[in-house]
Amino acid sequence: MAKQSMKAREVKRVALADKFFAKRAELKAIISDVNASDEDRWNAVLKLQSLPRDSSPSRQRNRCRQTGRPHAFLRKFGLSRIKVREAAMRGEIPGLKKASW
């Protein structure tokens, strides 16, 4: 199990990313616009750097919904490999069965 503080930190990062999504997109559009003046582009870079670091979506880490485990995360299920295996063995995931050949 991950620490509760780590789970809370991830929730905070998701909230910040949602809050600043439009602002970040607007600034990135200005930065990538070749027709904008150099001064405007540079000011946009400075404003983007002044935003909270955790508002960047790349700072988020996929975590297991049940345990908070950050490694071996399966996006399809939103769980770690360990919890997917346990759920599959109990028959809780429809259509998923253990491989046998």
From Swiss-Prot:
Keyword line: Ribonucleoprotein, Ribosomal protein, RNA-binding, rRNA-binding
A GO-annotated cellular component: cytoplasm
Disulfide bonds: none
Cited PROSITE patterns: RIBOSOMAL_S14
Keyword match RNA-binding: yes
UniProt-listed InterPro entries: Ribosomal_uS14 (IPR001209), Ribosomal_uS14_bac/plastid (IPR023036), Ribosomal_uS14_CS (IPR018271)
GO BP, sorted A to Z: translation
GO molecular function, one term: rRNA binding
rRNA-binding is among the record's keywords: yes
SUPFAM superfamilies per record: Glucocorticoid receptor-like (DNA-binding domain)
Superkingdom field: Bacteria
Assembly mode: Part of the 30S ribosomal subunit. Contacts proteins S3 and S10.
Described purpose of this protein according to its UniProt entry: Binds 16S rRNA, required for the assembly of 30S particles and may also be responsible for determining the conformation of the 16S rRNA at the A site.
Protein family: Belongs to the universal ribosomal protein uS14 family.
Name of the molecule in the record: Small ribosomal subunit protein uS14
